């Protein structure tokens, strides 16, 4: 089974038409191959490309993660655009000629060593090539990339390219925009890798992991030109530009904020703090000033920086001045470093400077009133010492007001449809509000002569500038400098003409004559004093330095001329916008003749100022004609209206005139181009997109009457004519019917052609009236039925039975993915075995499979496949269901921050705890650094610094790893010192006095320990014990007990140490015969009496404890009787000991011999009331330690020691308890405590002799095992009915009779015949060679029921002390008087905990003593059988030849043995066998 699965998983597949259709069905693609444009064939194990001839319309083919080694089979895929072949075995790029439209090719993770056959002649439109993780190495392997003229994305990452000549290849790829080279050695070999590639690839926009920004390219070019210093300067220039942009945006925000604040609460604007900017600006200013001092003034005027006026009103500079000053240095540095054309427009060109909003509004309104009253506007000429445009405002409120005024709707002709209108209602609202506010203030303020004076100065300056264009001198430096100014002044003259025309339009209705144009240019021949000072002829020879300086000045002047030219164009556009806004505010005057002349003049001006855009000029003309027609219609309607309406219109025109004048003044002070949207605010207007230009100059909002709409719009039909509408509907219906008929015919032809080759389902859908052709329905149904019949025939062959019925799903079109419903057939595999391993353990999978095999082998058996899962599986499934519940989100309410805070708190708490522990340890270490000396026969601590004497600290209490869960008050009173470690001592004086002194000293130490501070108590922890163990060892090395003077205080400690040394000597010698003298016997008798007195004391009112106390009392009485019998048994053991016979082979756990015993009903009833106990043995090491402390001797026999302990029910009875915490004694025993020494000291003493102890225990264990194998032929037969323990604790002591031996051998012969069925021959041979006595431990480990010998051997291995317990021996001959007297107490004693069996243990020197097992009881129902099983197992294995057989009768029974054969790992049951046998037993 595993081989077939492995072959199926690792085997390669082939592309077949049937398999491809199945994949299309799985991916919900069309079943007709040529209808698919995408095909997913990845992760299929294909080894070659084939069977794709029918998929002619494919545009995207996925073939990654297969085993394809060659590119082939693509001859018919002429429309393929994307081919994905990554993660294959391709070694060469070939056979791509048919795919002429291939755009994307992915060949990553293959074995390609050279790029070839992908040039423009093969793949003319290849755009993306991904060939990462291959074997490309040098420039030769990449040389063919030069032929890829259209390749723009190239991924060469994670190859082996190390040739730096690849840069030349990339340099010849003109369209390369994205390049990935990371993961190649060449990246580290190329010096300045990123800059080199940026310079080599002119169109590169993305390199490796990040884009190539314009800044990166500029820095790379500077690095190539001027080295690292040039790169640094270029980088600083970009940084300054970014800082300036940020500063300007912040200043703009501050200005907007200040516009809503009073003057005293306004924030200052940010100034440039870059010293380098200031230095560059100063240097540039000095250079220009050397040749022409007026250049600085010109730059100041262009950038908006004005000096303080000679008038006294503008002595304090405004916030706008500060902004202009702060940006001037940066602007000059930027322009000089770039040496490029001036981009963008100045943010502020013309601003007026007045004191505040109140004075500005006052001047405007008074000036408008003066215009209405005056009959003529006279502009006087005044001498001006310097070119001065219009001063800046001193307050932000003025600027905001003017901005609102200038943001009105502006008209510009465009190429939209005639009916297109762009309405800018939002911009009209602030303008109307401003006009109204100006009208309200008109009556409150008077005329100001200051504003008129400024206006006159401006006009004079413009006139003087216009006269400069007539200068005609030789081509000198001065002439080159004056050339750009002349051009600018020409533009100014054109602007003045436009302004005059605007004034003519505005004041046409008034009768006041005016001649603005003549006044502007009345002094054309006058030479301005501005240039008189500069025109000087220098006849002196020029030096080389001066010549170079003049050349630089010429370059700067040319740059300024170009910039001024750009500004002139901007002014033209701004004036055109101003003109359009003026027309929107005033409209067309009543005098049509004058209006026509003004329009003609405007056209001439537009032709002069915008000669570069004839398209816009034509659009202006068309739009103007439309507006004229509209206004003519309005004029005709107005002539038919009332005279009152006409008068009101005239008053409205007067209001419009006032509004116009205010608008003119505001626009004259701020002439900012009104750009509404779009990025690149620093771009020239000449390069604006056409769509953006059309949206910048919005159309006015004109409310047209229905008559006007009829002029430009003509409805298709008459809404009141039903006949015409019906006729149109009929015509449209006919047209749709014809189209539908033609389409139906075309579809019919296509279906007829397709159905001849393929079987398809077609359903044509229409949203409106439809008609379908179903002429081929018969052929389609026939083909479907044929497919179904073939499938049914195949299923019938597999299932050997015909299905009863089939449900046909909906026949869908290819658009809806055909065959969406699978036929409901009977499944070959049962549902329980579809996915046997999901959510199941290995054992459950094997059980399910075995149930399936059994159900297939014998159909009559009940089906077991639906059995309930085990508890472990139920927990897993419950956890999976819990994960799917909706309430699970409540468990994840804790955010990452809260969890991190909790973790931080826990870490901090742990650190504090560790710090406190370390502090305590080091505090105690300071004490141990002091010296130890004997003062008056007492061990004292002498302080190093002061010399003071201190007592030794009390010994640390025993700290256990686990805690007992029993609520037993006696365990709380237990202390580690309450143990007696006396295995044997020599004769010593006053033992009773020694024990009492030790007890008193321990109590005193405990009292003194309680009085110590908390630091002393906390010191006794596990960490401190391990830390200062070496210090304790050093202390005891200094202590020499032989040199200590004997006294009352030191005598207990010295005696204790001597007793310990004597004990070690006894254990080394291996002697087990420990004789006690009279003093020791009296001491033990006293201890027994104390125990009895303690038992008599009532400890609690609990009924269970009282019952246990009664049992203990009875145990004490019985043990006295046991001691007498044991003394007699010791005499018999020497006579009847003999060697054990050979041991035969047995199979673990099988029951071959059973001896039924008669158990009184009272015992069974009493045992049913006992708590259920586990069959595992108690920790024998702890048990023996406890038993050794409870020695009781009543008869004075020095060779017999006994111990009793009751076990309380615990929750963790099945878990082996810890040695230091398994204290379950229910009685209070008087104990003798050792001297108050630390545990580390005792450990050091104990570890010194540990190896000797282990050796002694091993020898005792071997001696005990030899005694167990001895054969006792002369054991007396005793009736089991006369002994109180005959029911549960009978041990066989005599070998069976010859008939029983022959019967057992016959049964074993039958079993041995079948051993080869479940054991291999090698194992059987090893078992036959091995003696049972040698493999005793191995067989015991396989046995389910632990035998008595196993318990004894485990006790001897785990303990370092030999504990001999008394037990019954059934071979002892009881007289008739003593045995019946003990029958009354047999029931009670049989129910005691801890006494389940009694075994005999013959020894070599001591005689026969027995070891009592303290194992736990089983349930009350199986108690008799359990005892019987253990007895029979012991006898069947022939581990003892002293079996006691009751010869009253023989019982033959039929028994069954279940055997489980495990796998090699021992965790899976491979086979289960059942063995039947007949067993004869004696009654």
Curated annotation (Swiss-Prot):
Residues 249-282, 300-327, 945-986, 1167-1213 are annotated as: Disordered. Residues 1183-1196 have a biased composition (Basic and acidic residues). Keywords: Cell projection, Cilium, Leucine-rich repeat, Repeat. Disulfide bonds: none annotated. Residues 311-327 have a biased composition (Polar residues). LRR repeats lie at residues 34-56, 57-78, 79-100, 101-122, 125-146, 150-171. GO terms for molecular function: dynein complex binding. GO terms for biological process: axoneme assembly; chemical synaptic transmission; cilium assembly. Gene3D superfamilies: Ribonuclease Inhibitor. It is found in: Cell projection, Cilium. Residues 185-223 form the LRRCT domain. One of its GO terms (cellular component) is synapse. InterPro entries: Cilia_flagella_integrity (IPR050576), Leu-rich_rpt (IPR001611), LRR_dom_sf (IPR032675). PROSITE patterns: LRR. Belongs to the DNAAF1 family. Cilium-specific protein required for cilia structures. This is Dynein axonemal assembly factor 1 homolog. The gene is dtr.
């Amino acid at each position: 089974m595993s081989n077939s699965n492995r072959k199926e998983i690792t085997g390669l597949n082939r592309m077949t038409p049937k398999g491809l259709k199945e994949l299309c069905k799985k991916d919900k693609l069309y079943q007709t191959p040529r209808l698919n444009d995408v095909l997913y064939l990845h992760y299929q194990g294909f080894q070659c490309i084939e069977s794709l001839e029918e998929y002619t319309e494919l545009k995207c083919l996925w073939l990654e993660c297969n085993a394809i080694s060659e590119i082939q089979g693509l001859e018919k895929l002429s429309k393929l655009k994307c081919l994905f072949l990554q993660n294959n075995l391709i070694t060469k790029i070939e056979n791509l000629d048919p795919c002429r439209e291939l755009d994307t090719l992915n060949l990553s993770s293959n074995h390609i060593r050279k790029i070839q056959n992908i040039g423009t002649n093969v793949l003319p439109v290849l755009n993306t090539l991904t060939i990462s993780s291959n074997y490309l190495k040098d420039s030769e392997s990449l040389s063919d990339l030069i032929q890829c003229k259209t390749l723009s994305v190239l991924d060469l990452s994670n190859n082996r390219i190390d040739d730096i000549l690849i840069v030349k290849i990339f340099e010849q790829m003109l369209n390369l925009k994205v390049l990935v080279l990371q993961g190649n050695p060449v990246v580290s070999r190329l010096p300045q890798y990123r800059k080199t590639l940026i310079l080599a690839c002119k169109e590169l926009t993305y390199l490796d992991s990040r884009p190539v920004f314009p800044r990166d390219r500029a820095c790379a070019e500077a690095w190539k030109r001027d080295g690292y210093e040039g790169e640094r300067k270029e980088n600083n220039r970009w940084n300054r530009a970014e800082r300036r942009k940020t500063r300007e945006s912040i200043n703009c925000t501050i200005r907007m904020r200040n516009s809503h604040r009073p003057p005293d609460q306004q924030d200052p604007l940010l100034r440039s703090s870059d010293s380098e900017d200031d230095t560059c600006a100063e240097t540039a200013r000095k250079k220009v000033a050397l040749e022409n001092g007026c250049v600085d003034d010109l730059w100041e005027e262009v950038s908006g920086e004005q000096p303080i006026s000679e008038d006294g009103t503008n002595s304090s500079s405004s916030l706008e001045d500060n902004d202009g000053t702060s940006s001037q240095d940066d602007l000059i540095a930027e322009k000089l470093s770039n040496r490029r054309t001036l981009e963008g427009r100045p943010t502020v060109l013309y601003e007026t400077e007045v004191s505040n909003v109140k004075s500005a509004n006052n001047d405007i309104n008074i000036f408008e009133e003066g215009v209405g009253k005056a009959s003529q506007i006279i502009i006087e000429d005044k001498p001006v010492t310097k070119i001065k445009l219009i001063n800046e405002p001193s307050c932000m409120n003025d600027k905001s007001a003017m901005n609102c005024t200038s943001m009105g709707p502006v008209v510009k002709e465009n190429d939209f449809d005639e009916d297109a209108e762009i309405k800018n209602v939002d911009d009209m609202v602030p303008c109307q509000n401003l006009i109204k506010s100006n009208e309200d203030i008109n009556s409150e303020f008077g005329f100001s002569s200051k504003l008129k004076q400024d206006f006159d100065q401006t006009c004079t300056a413009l006139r003087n500038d216009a006269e400069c264009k007539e200068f005609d001198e030789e081509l000198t430096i001065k002439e080159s400098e004056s050339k750009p100014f002349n051009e600018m002044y020409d533009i100014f003259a054109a602007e003045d003409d436009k302004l005059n025309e605007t004034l003519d339009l505005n004041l046409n209705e008034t009768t006041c004559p005016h001649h603005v144009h003549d006044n502007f240019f009345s002094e054309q021949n006058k030479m301005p004093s501005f240039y008189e000072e500069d025109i000087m002829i220098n006849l002196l020879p020029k030096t080389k330095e001066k010549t170079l300086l003049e050349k630089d000045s010429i370059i700067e002047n040319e740059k300024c001329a170009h910039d001024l030219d750009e500004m002139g164009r901007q002014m033209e556009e701004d004036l055109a916008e101003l003109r359009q806004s003026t027309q929107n505010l005033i409209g067309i005057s009543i005098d049509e003749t004058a209006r026509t002349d003004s329009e003609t003049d405007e056209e001439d001006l537009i032709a002069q100022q915008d000669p570069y855009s004839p398209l816009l000029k034509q659009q202006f003309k068309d739009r103007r004609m439309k507006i004229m027609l509209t206004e003519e219609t309005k004029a005709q309607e107005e002539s038919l209206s009332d005279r009152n309406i006409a008068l009101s219109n005239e008053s409205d025109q007067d209001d419009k005139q006032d509004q116009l004048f205010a608008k003119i003044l505001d626009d004259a002070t701020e002439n900012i181009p009104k750009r509404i949207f779009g990025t690149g605010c620093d771009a020239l207007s000449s390069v604006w997109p056409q769509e953006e230009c059309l949206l910048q100059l919005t159309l006015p909002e004109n409310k047209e009457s229905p008559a006007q709409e009829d002029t430009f719009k003509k409805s298709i039909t008459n809404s009141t004519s039903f006949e015409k509408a019906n006729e149109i509907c009929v015509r449209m219906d006919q047209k749709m019917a014809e189209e539908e008929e033609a389409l139906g015919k075309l579809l019919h032809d296509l279906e007829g052609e397709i159905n001849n080759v393929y079987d398809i389902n077609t359903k044509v859908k229409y949203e409106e009236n439809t008609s379908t052709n179903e002429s081929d329905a018969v052929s389609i149904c026939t083909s479907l039925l044929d497919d179904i019949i073939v499938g049914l025939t195949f299923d019938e062959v597999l299932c050997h039975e015909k299905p009863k019925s089939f449900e046909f799903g909906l026949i869908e079109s290819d658009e809806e993915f055909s065959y969406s419903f699978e036929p409901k057939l009977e499944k070959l595999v049962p549902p329980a075995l579809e996915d046997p391993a999901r959510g199941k353990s290995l054992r459950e999978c094997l059980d399910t499979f075995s149930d399936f095999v059994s159900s297939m082998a014998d159909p009559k058996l009940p089906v077991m496949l639906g059995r309930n899962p085990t508890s472990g599986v139920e927990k897993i499934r419950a956890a999976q269901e819990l994960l799917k519940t909706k309430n699970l989100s409540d468990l994840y309410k804790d955010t990452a921050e809260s969890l991190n805070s909790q973790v931080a708190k826990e870490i901090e708490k742990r650190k504090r705890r560790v710090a406190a522990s370390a502090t305590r340890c080091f505090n105690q270490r300071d004490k141990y650094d002091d010296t130890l000396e004997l003062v008056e026969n007492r061990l004292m601590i002498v302080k190093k610094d002061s010399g003071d004497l201190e007592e030794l600290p009390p010994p640390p209490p025993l700290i256990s790893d686990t805690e007992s869960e029993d609520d037993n008050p006696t365990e709380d009173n237990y202390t580690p010192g309450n143990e007696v470690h006396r295995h044997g001592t020599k004769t010593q004086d006053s033992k009773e006095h020694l024990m009492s002194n030790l007890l008193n000293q321990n109590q005193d130490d405990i009292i003194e320990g309680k009085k110590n501070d908390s630091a002393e108590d906390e010191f006794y922890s596990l960490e401190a014990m391990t830390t200062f163990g070496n210090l304790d060892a050093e202390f005891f090395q200094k202590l020499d007990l032989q040199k200590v003077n004997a006294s009352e205080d030191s005598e207990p400690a010295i005696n204790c140490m001597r007793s310990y040394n004597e004990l070690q000597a006894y254990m080394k010698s291996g002697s087990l015969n420990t004789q006690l003298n009279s003093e020791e016997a009296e001491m033990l008798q006293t201890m027994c009496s104390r125990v009895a007195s303690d038992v008599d004391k009532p400890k609690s009112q609990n009924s269970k404890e009282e019952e246990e106390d009664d049992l203990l009392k009875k145990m004490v009485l019985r043990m006295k009787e046991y001691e007498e019998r044991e003394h007699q048994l010791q005499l018999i053991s020497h006579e009847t000991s003999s060697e054990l016979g050979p041991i035969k082979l047995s199979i673990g756990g099988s029951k071959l011999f059973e001896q039924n015993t008669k158990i009184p009903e009272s015992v069974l009833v009493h045992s049913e009331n006992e708590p259920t106990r586990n069959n595992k043995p108690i920790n024998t090491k702890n048990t023996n330690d406890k038993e050794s402390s409870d020695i009781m001797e009543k008869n004075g026999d020095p060779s017999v020691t006994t111990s009793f302990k009751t076990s309380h029910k615990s929750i963790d009875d099945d878990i082996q308890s810890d040695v230091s915490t398994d204290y379950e004694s229910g009685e209070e025993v008087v104990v003798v405590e050792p001297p108050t020494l630390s545990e580390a000291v005792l450990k050091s003493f104990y570890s010194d002799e540990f190896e000797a102890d282990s050796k002694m225990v091993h020898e005792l264990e071997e001696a005990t095992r030899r005694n167990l194998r001895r054969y006792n032929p002369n054991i007396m037969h005793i009736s089991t009915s006369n002994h109180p323990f005959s029911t549960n604790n009978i041990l066989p002591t005599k070998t069976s009779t010859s008939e029983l031996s022959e019967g057992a051998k016959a049964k074993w012969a039958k079993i041995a015949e079948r051993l080869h069925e479940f054991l291999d021959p090698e194992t059987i041979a090893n078992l036959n060679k091995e003696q049972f006595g040698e493999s005793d431990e191995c067989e015991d480990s396989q046995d389910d029921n632990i035998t008595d010998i196993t318990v004894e051997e485990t006790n001897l291995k785990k303990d370092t002390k030999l504990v001999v317990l008394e037990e019954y021996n059934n071979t002892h001959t009881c007289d008739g008087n003593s045995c019946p007297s003990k029958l009354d107490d047999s029931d009670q004693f049989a129910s005691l905990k801890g006494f389940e069996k009694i075994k005999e243990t013959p020894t070599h020197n001591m005689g026969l003593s027995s070891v009592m097992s303290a194992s736990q009881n089983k349930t009350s129902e199986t108690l008799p059988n359990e005892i019987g099983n253990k007895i029979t197992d012991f006898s069947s294995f022939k581990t003892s030849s002293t079996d006691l057989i009751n010869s009253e009768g023989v019982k033959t029974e039929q028994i069954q043995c279940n055997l489980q054969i495990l796998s090699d790992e021992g965790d899976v049951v491979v086979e289960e066998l059942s063995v039947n046998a007949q067993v004869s037993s004696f009654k």
